[in-house]
Amino acid sequence: MERYFGTYQTFRTVSKKDAAVLMGSNTLVGDRNRINLTMDEGVHRAWLINKFNETIGYFDDGFSRELSLFAAEGLELVGILSFVAFTETPEPGEYWGQAAVIGYSPHYAEEFNRFIDGVCGLIGKGIRPKLALNGPAVDEIINSNGTWLPSEREPLPEKQRGMALLKTRRGFIDGLVEAGRTGNKGCYILSWAFLLALVAAIIIGLKSCGVF
């Protein structure tokens, strides 16, 4: 059995309507997500599922099949949201993104879960560590009890015409949302207060401009 597998992989949304989940506060950059493997009429499909059991998107057939093979070997699979993008063409446009996909042997679950937590933290800050690691690097993860992290970086894909990067890191509000998730009610209330104040400021600004 392989001990480790890691890469960045593009995923797509089923429709623009389904992209609401991807753009919402339930899906943050750096979130650790579940990968659900299905088979439909002989075609492998790997779905990215967020912490709230909502579907974020899906991987292409070839990569889905590769993940199915890793799962058959016994590897645990996770997907970490790296960025969200929108492309204008083909019309009416498409929401998509990339996830850091990691597979690991459950024999080293403690070490790799700690490693994944570290990767999530970096990605949440907009830092994309290299994940295609060789044997010695995998040994570093295990021997350090998961505290070792790659120093090499993976650049964002080059922007094309008509392409916009919508989420690449966590912002201030995202930090408050995450604190609210973990039970910090004060941060949760503060996040809503901030949003309401922002909306109020926009309305006041529009009124002062004579919009309504």
Language-model features: where?
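Conserved active-site motif detector
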Residues: 1-212
